[in-house]
C-alpha cells in the first residue's frame, strides 16, 4: 500500500492532504511515507524525543489554536499537519478559496475592506472533516496597511443534500498573545427558514410573501462586491470538487445572473446583499459551458462564523 501511495504522490495524481486522509483511515502514521511537513525532511526521533515533542506539539496547538506549528514536532497520525509555502509557492486552488472566504467573513464582521494577497502557510487536519488553519496576508484598502489574518475553515460532509459544505470557525487578525478557545457553529441558532434540505429553485411567492424578499444583482453590485465572484468560483468548485485540475481549467467564470433571496425585507433592495442569511441563485458560464448554482449563506450570529452550502448543475455547452 505504501509503495502505491508513494507512486501516486510522485506522479502528482495524489495530494499530500488526500494521502494524509487515506493513512489516517488505515491507522498508519504519515511519516511512513515521509510526507513533507516543511520544505526540508524532518529526521527521525527516539521514543523519549517523541514524548517530549508530543508535549511541544500540544503546547503549540493550544497556544495558537492550531495556526502556528513549527514542523519540527512529532505530529500525531490524526493531528494538525503544517504546510509551508514559502515566498513564491501558491496553495492549491481549494485552499486559496478557503483563505478568501475567511477574508470575506472578517470584512462582514468588522466592516473592513481587507484584500486577499497570499497564503504563506496553512495547517490541515483529518479525518472527521477537512479543517484548514490558514494564515493569510491581506492589505487594508482603507489605508494601504498590511495585516496577517488567521482563518479556520472546515469542509465537512453533506447534511442537507448539498454538494459542498464549508464553514468558518475563526476569522481574526493574528493576535500577539494567545486568545480564546475555538467556538463551533451553533446550527440550532440559524434561522429556521435557512435550515433543512437545500432548495433547487427560487422559492415561489405565497399569499403572504413580499417581493422585497428578492433582488436581482446588478453589474455595479458585482464590481463593488468581489465576494459575489468568490461565491461563483465556489459554485464552480462545487461541481468540480473531485477534479481540481478540471476546476482550474474552467476559470475564469462569467457571471450571467444572480438572484438574492432573503427574509430580510429591506426597503433598499441592494441591502439584501448584506443580509446575514441569504440564498444566492447564480447562473454563470465557464469554459463555454453554462451552469446553475444555489448557494446558501447562513450564520449563527457569532463573529467569525459563516456556513456556505452549495449545489451546482451544468446546463449545457455554448
From Swiss-Prot:
Belongs to the UPF0725 (EMB2204) family. Pfam families: protein_MS5. It comes from Arabidopsis thaliana (Mouse-ear cress). NCBIfam families: A_thl_para_3677. It comes from the Eukaryota. InterPro entries: MS5. This is UPF0725 protein At3g44770.
Amino acid at each position: 500500500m505504501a509503495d502505491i501511495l508513494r507512486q501516486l504522490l510522485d506522479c502528482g495524481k495524489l495530494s499530500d492532504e488526500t494521502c494524509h486522509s487515506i493513512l489516517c483511515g488505515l491507522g498508519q502514521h504519515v511519516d511512513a511515507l515521509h510526507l513533507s511537513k516543511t520544505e526540508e525532511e524532518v529526521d527521525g526521533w527516539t521514543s523519549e524525543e517523541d514524548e517530549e515533542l508530543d508535549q511541544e506539539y500540544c503546547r503549540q496547538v493550544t497556544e495558537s489554536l492550531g495556526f502556528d506549528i513549527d514542523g519540527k514536532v512529532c505530529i500525531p497520525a490524526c493531528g494538525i499537519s503544517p504546510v509551508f509555502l514559502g515566498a513564491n509557492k501558491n496553495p492549491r486552488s481549494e485552499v486559496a478559496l478557503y483563505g478568501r472566504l475567511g477574508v470575506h467573513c472578517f470584512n462582514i464582521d468588522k466592516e473592513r475592506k481587507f484584500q486577499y494577497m497570499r497564503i504563506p502557510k496553512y495547517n490541515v487536519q483529518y479525518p472527521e472533516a477537512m479543517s484548514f488553519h490558514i494564515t493569510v496576508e491581506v492589505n487594508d484598502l482603507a489605508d494601504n496597511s498590511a495585516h496577517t489574518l488567521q482563518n479556520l475553515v472546515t469542509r465537512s460532509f453533506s447534511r442537507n443534500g448539498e454538494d459542498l459544505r464549508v464553514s468558518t470557525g475563526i476569522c481574526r487578525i493574528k493576535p500577539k498573545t494567545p486568545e480564546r478557545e475555538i467556538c463551533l457553529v451553533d446550527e440550532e441558532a440559524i434561522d429556521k427558514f435557512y435550515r433543512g434540505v437545500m432548495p433547487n429553485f427560487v422559492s415561489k411567492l405565497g399569499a403572504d410573501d413580499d417581493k422585497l424578499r428578492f433582488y436581482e444583482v446588478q453589474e455595479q453590485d458585482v464590481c463593488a462586491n468581489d465576494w459575489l465572484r468568490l461565491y461563483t468560483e465556489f459554485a464552480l468548485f462545487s461541481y468540480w470538487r473531485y477534479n481540481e485540475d478540471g476546476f482550474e481549467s474552467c476559470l475564469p467564470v462569467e457571471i450571467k445572473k444572480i438572484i438574492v433571496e432573503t427574509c430580510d425585507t429591506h426597503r433598499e433592495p441592494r441591502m439584501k446583499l448584506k443580509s446575514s442569511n441569504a440564498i444566492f441563485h447564480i447562473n454563470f458560464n465557464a469554459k463555454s459551458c453554462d451552469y446553475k448554482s444555489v448557494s446558501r449563506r447562513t450564520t449563527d450570529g457569532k463573529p467569525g462564523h459563516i456556513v456556505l452550502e452549495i449545489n451546482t448543475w451544468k446546463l449545457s455547452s455554448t
